[in-house]
């Protein structure tokens, strides 16, 4: 009886591990190019749930207050696409080239993914 229970528990564990969401981004960086500091930059990262369970984005956040990421609130079905909207407000920041990470946390097998925004901010004239 113990063997049967152990075998059943092992099979159920393996099945739960195999059934997971997987997040795959179309691109992992977004280049805003050259822009003036007074112009807020906006963009989006498109991703697909390539797993077989619904994908839930728990958090998406930048490394500083100048970067805002807005993930979808609803779960993403297997095979469906979703979008994380991002904005960068460089007002009052240092001019020049930058590369800012955005950390995405989800229930996917790859539960933490980093995507990046980059650009070259110029001072206003």
Please annotate each region the language model reported:
Residues 52-83:
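Surface-exposed binding patches on compact interaction domains or structured appendages
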Residues 47-51:
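Asparagine-centered strand-capping/turn motif at beta-strand->loop junctions
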Residues 13-19:
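Sec/Tat signal peptide C-region and signal peptidase I cleavage site
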Residues 26, 38-44, 93-101:
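Short, solvent-exposed loop/turn segments enriched in Ser/Thr/Gly
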Residues 94-123:
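Terminal connector regions
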């Amino acid at each position: 009886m113990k063997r049967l229970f152990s075998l059943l528990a092992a099979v159920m564990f393996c099945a739960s591990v195999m059934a997971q969401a997987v997040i795959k981004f179309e691109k992992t960086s977004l280049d805003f190019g050259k822009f003036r500091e007074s112009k807020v930059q906006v963009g989006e990262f498109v991703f697909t749930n390539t797993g077989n369970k619904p994908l839930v984005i728990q958090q998406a956040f930048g490394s500083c207050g100048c970067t805002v990421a807005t993930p979808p609130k609803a779960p993403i079905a297997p095979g469906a696409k979703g979008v994380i909207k991002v904005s960068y407000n460089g007002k009052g920041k240092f001019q020049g080239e930058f590369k800012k990470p955005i950390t995405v946390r989800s229930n996917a097998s790859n539960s933490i993914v980093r995507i990046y925004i980059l650009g070259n901010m110029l001072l206003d004239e």
